[in-house]
Amino acid sequence: MTNEQRKTVYNKQLELNNRILGERFGLNILELNEEQKQIWLLNFCRATTHELYELQDAILNEDDHNIVVECVDILHFIVSIGQILGLECNQCFSYDPLFETTRWLDCIMPKIEKSRKLINMLEDSVNWKWWGSKTVDWEYTKDVYQWLLSDFYSLVSLLGI
């Protein structure tokens, strides 16, 4: 993906998020308060988890078209999570390149499971525990986001998209 394409995806997603959040809830994704960030990060994490299950089904059913559709859906939710975290476009798409593999399917399913675990980590990072502190470590949440983004790029690369 070129820098121009990344900017387009980021800006279009920002526009869509603000239109949806604005029309339905009177919110701007870049101006959410602490509680709203938590709520929407959890919403987008849950949606991403759902899309990961759909991607797994598409892979198992060898549905090439739907594999691409699900990856695009996942990308939109990941970009939305980055926007909630206050990341600029270049930060949203910045990652460390990962590994290459020869055992395609044996590698894909664990990557999907790892992505689901990272989504759970994101959810846990903003869910308050009754026994813990009542604050969110947003820097840790951004770190988990970077792991998720890196994992997503690896998954898309393995799928040849």
Model-derived segments and spans:
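Flexible "arm" and connector segments at domain edges
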Residues: 1-161
